[in-house]
């Protein structure tokens, strides 16, 4: 079903690392990170919820959430959160501790900020701490157009196996913070480049704004924004676009092994321009019609690989060499058939 990856291969390296501290908000590029069972440090450890229902809110339905910008400040040990003003066009920055509330509250298990009914994707209710000053809560609520709260994930273990309808690898029981399905998402720069190269032709053929999607316009923006796809680890040096579809196990650096579990079926979040918070109808579906490649994902296009660390802790940095230890063979007609494709 899989084989040791022995073909001649250029050296693959970690090109970029990204964390998204607040679910559905803007990401931050970093040079290195420790990781735990829930993924890179501070990745999706906070989320914004409706103040009444405690249901999580997402840029899938509120695209402008991507303009809320949390930044990890190691010097002050704070998460600095810049919130745009819905009326003035300006923005204000507020801070919450990076430290988990359980480490600084006098009685964390009985603190009034702790609640147990926060809802993420129909899972069993999750525990979490309501955090942030009244000023931050007010700014977020005004921007979101409803009463909201900022929540830090509690200590209760959230397993992938608890997420309804999500596949999980036999023998692996990944846990995660407030991410949707898995603690890590891996993508390759080669695949992004190939996708970017398609856009001008597809835009012209399908009647989209050719000026907006011309090669020069895309280049002036630094290329298609990888943040649309919200990966944590972007690798360079992969020989063929979407070769990562066939990966099963990789090693990053000397001994940090990562299980590459499943293709990531994309919702409409990649259609949101991270610079403007406005949805683009061209992406992802119009450009990626040939990326309906996972039988278990139905008609959804796929980009990136849902993954999980094998170790409970470790570290990753930009420039780390990535070694593919196990991979599925490429089929004669192109593409890869993974275990989940064979059994479903």
PLM region descriptions:
Residues 1-344:
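Metal-cofactor-dependent catalytic cores
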């Amino acid at each position: 079903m899989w084989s040791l990856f022995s073909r001649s291969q250029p050296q693959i390296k970690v090109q970029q690392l990204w964390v998204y501290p607040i679910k559905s908000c803007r990401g931050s590029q970093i040079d290195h990170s420790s990781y735990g069972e829930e993924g890179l440090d501070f990745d999706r450890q906070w989320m914004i919820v409706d103040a009444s229902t405690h249901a999580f809110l997402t840029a899938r339905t509120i695209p402008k959430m991507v303009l809320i910008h949390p930044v990890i400040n190691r010097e002050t040990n704070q998460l600095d959160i810049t919130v745009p003003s819905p009326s003035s066009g300006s923005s204000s920055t507020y801070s919450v501790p990076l430290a988990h509330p359980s480490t600084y509250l006098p009685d964390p298990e009985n603190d009034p900020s702790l609640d147990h009914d926060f809802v993420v994707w129909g899972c069993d209710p999750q525990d979490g701490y309501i955090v942030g000053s009244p000023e931050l809560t007010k700014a977020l609520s005004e921007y979101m157009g409803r009463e909201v709260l900022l929540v830090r994930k509690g200590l209760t273990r959230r397993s992938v196996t608890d997420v309804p309808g999500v596949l999980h690898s036999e023998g692996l029981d990944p846990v995660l913070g407030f991410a949707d399905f898995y603690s890590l998402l891996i993508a390759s720069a080669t695949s992004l480049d190939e996708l970017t190269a398609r856009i001008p032709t597809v835009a012209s053929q399908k009647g989209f704004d050719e000026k907006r999607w011309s090669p020069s316009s895309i280049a002036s923006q630094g290329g298609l924004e990888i943040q649309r796809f919200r990966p944590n680890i972007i690798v360079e040096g992969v020989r063929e676009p979407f070769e990562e579809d066939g990966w099963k196990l990789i090693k990053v650096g000397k001994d940090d092994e990562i299980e590459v579990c499943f293709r990531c079926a994309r919702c409409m979040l990649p259609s949101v321009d991270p610079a403007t918070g406005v949805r683009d109808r061209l992406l992802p579906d119009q450009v990626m019609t040939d990326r309906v490649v996972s039988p278990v994902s139905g008609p959804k296009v796929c980009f990136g690989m849902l993954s999980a660390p094998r170790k409970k802790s470790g570290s990753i940095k930009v420039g780390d060499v990535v070694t593919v230890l196990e991979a599925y063979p490429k089929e004669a007609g192109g593409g890869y058939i993974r275990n989940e494709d064979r059994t479903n």
